[in-house]
Amino acid sequence: MKTLTRKLSRTAITLVLVILAFIAIFRAWVYYTESPWTRDARFSADVVAIAPDVAGLITNVSVHDNQLVKKDQILFTIDQPRYKKALEEAEADVAYYQVLAQEKRQEAGRRNRLGVQAMSREEIDQANNVLQTVLHQLAKAQATRDLAKLDLERTVIRAPADGWVTNLNVYTGEFITRGSTAVALVKQHSFYVLAYMEETKLEGVRPGYRAEITPLGSNKVLKGTVDSVAAGVTNASSTRDAKGMATIDSNLEWVRLAQRVPVRIRLDDQQDNLWPAGTTATVVITGKQDRDETQDSFFRKMAHRLREFG
């Protein structure tokens, strides 16, 4: 009898432990799979593609790759003598037409004062027409001069904002064409995180909710706030034909993968380029307030650690 009782006790204890372990694992798994978090997140920043508005030989490159520059700092300079000559020519044209316009204005004024008593109406009208033509030519010359001045100013390529020069691929002596991207500028203090959340987890994501960001390979946890949720993503199963009609994929997959929706997260503290744009991170949405780590249960802490490994 005593042996039977002992066996039953052992069996009951084992069964209870198995049930408790199953409950703990189940709760951890539910929390792990259904709570709003993702390992598919990336640091991003505002990037300006810098391209010259004029063409010519590069005479000087004033920065080096990955350099931190200030707004209006010179990045590189394009051959200026040619544009200076163009400006001088345009200014000479303006001066010529200014003198010519003054002469024609005086002549037209003189003929208008004399009137039809001294000359024919045709001669008076002709003088006025010549004056208007010269004035139009003067206006055109002034516009050409202003454009030449603008081109000369734009031979000096400056940084549009504070930031880091990256992917610098221009060198002194190269010929660069108008509109060709020469360098990218990553704006300082513009870093944010794009977290690609599965659609099944969007119920727990709202603008204003707090977020924890853990960069890949780091134990440091950054804080942030959900700024916005994308209003739409591309529908890969629907396209348009040549007439604009919808074309729907007739194949229905047995396993439906949850779509990922971009969620923009604003960082509380800018980390400069400590984590460059494009690097990955794990993001956890904690709700309206930051998570109190001291109140986390064991299985919740375990779930947080599991996130770092998949």
Curated annotation (Swiss-Prot):
Q: Which Pfam families match?
A: CusB_dom_1, HlyD_D23
Alphabetized, the UniProt keywords read: Cell inner membrane, Cell membrane, Membrane, Transmembrane, Transmembrane helix, Transport
| Family annotation (Gene3D superfamilies) | 2.40.30.170, 2.40.50.100
User: Can you say where in the cell this protein is located?
Assistant: Cell inner membrane
The parts of the chain that form a coiled coil are none
Q: Which GO terms describe its cellular component?
A: plasma membrane
- Any one GO molecular-function label of the UniProt entry: transmembrane transporter activity
Q: Which InterPro entries match?
A: CusB-like_dom_1 (IPR043602), CusB_D23 (IPR032317), MFP_Efflux_Pump (IPR050393), PHBA_efflux_pump_AaeA (IPR022871), RND_pump_MFP (IPR006143)
Show the stretches that span the lipid bilayer: 12-32
The protein's topology relative to the membrane is: Single-pass membrane protein
Q: What S-S linkages are listed for this chain?
A: none
What this protein is reported to do is described as: Forms an efflux pump with AaeB.
State the similarity comment.
Belongs to the membrane fusion protein (MFP) (TC 8.A.1) family.
Identify the HAMAP family for this entry: AaeA (MF_01544)
In Swiss-Prot or TrEMBL terms, this protein is called p-hydroxybenzoic acid efflux pump subunit AaeA
Please give the organism.
Citrobacter koseri (strain ATCC BAA-895 / CDC 4225-83 / SGSC4696)
Native organism taxonomy? Bacteria, Pseudomonadati, Pseudomonadota, Gammaproteobacteria, Enterobacterales
